[in-house]
Amino acid sequence: MKLELFRSLWGYAEQRANACREARGAGFTGIEARLPQTPAERRELGALLEGEGLAYIAILFTGGAVLPDQGLTPTEHLRDLERQLDASAELEPRFVNVLAGNDRWSTTQQLDFLGQAQEIARRGGHLCSFETHRARCLATPWVTLEIARQLPELLFTTDISHWVVGCERLLDDPADDLGDFVSRVHHIQARVGYDQGPQVP
């Protein structure tokens, strides 16, 4: 295992050029940031990354922004995923971190959706890691454990703070055995926090 540190631009309000310069200066391997939506913005980011010698982790959302459009179907989310994965290839990301689907879907729907999403990524030659996040598939540890068992090749990005918020506990009880999930974590989004404030801004 090799530890590489990427600076997250989640909530970063300044220009990307500043972020890239700061990341390089601080010794980060690269940045993790939302996929720019226009070709011009992607070209601009690509030039910044190349100029600073930084790697890139692309973040994309299916079916809208952080909170998905509640009216979109799994099929529409899959079409959106495919379109954005094609666009992300322009930046040659190390991998793509995907906030996928909708937590309102049943476990069966989430399994089917994530299986199809995994196949879309495989066909396109994209390495994808699916993030644990409220309002999305993988919003709870219990659904995620079932998905991990049934989709043995699916990789995960963990921001465990979302589960701590949703479950109202640290998930450190022996009964909270997350081993099947932990063994498949590809990417960790670390946060500073405490038991009643796991998402300190």
Residue ranges and their predicted role:
Residues Q70-F156:
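Active-site acidic/histidine proton-transfer and metal-coordination neighborhood
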Residues M1-S8, I31-A33, Y56-F61, R94-V98, ...:
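Hydrophobic faces of well-ordered beta-strands that scaffold small-molecule active sites
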Residues G27-T29, E52-L54, E92, Q150-L155, ...:
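Glycine-enriched alpha-helix->loop->beta-strand junction motifs that scaffold or abut catalytic
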Residues F6-Y12, R34-P36, F61-A65, G101-D103, ...:
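Active-site beta-loop-alpha junctions enriched in small/polar residues
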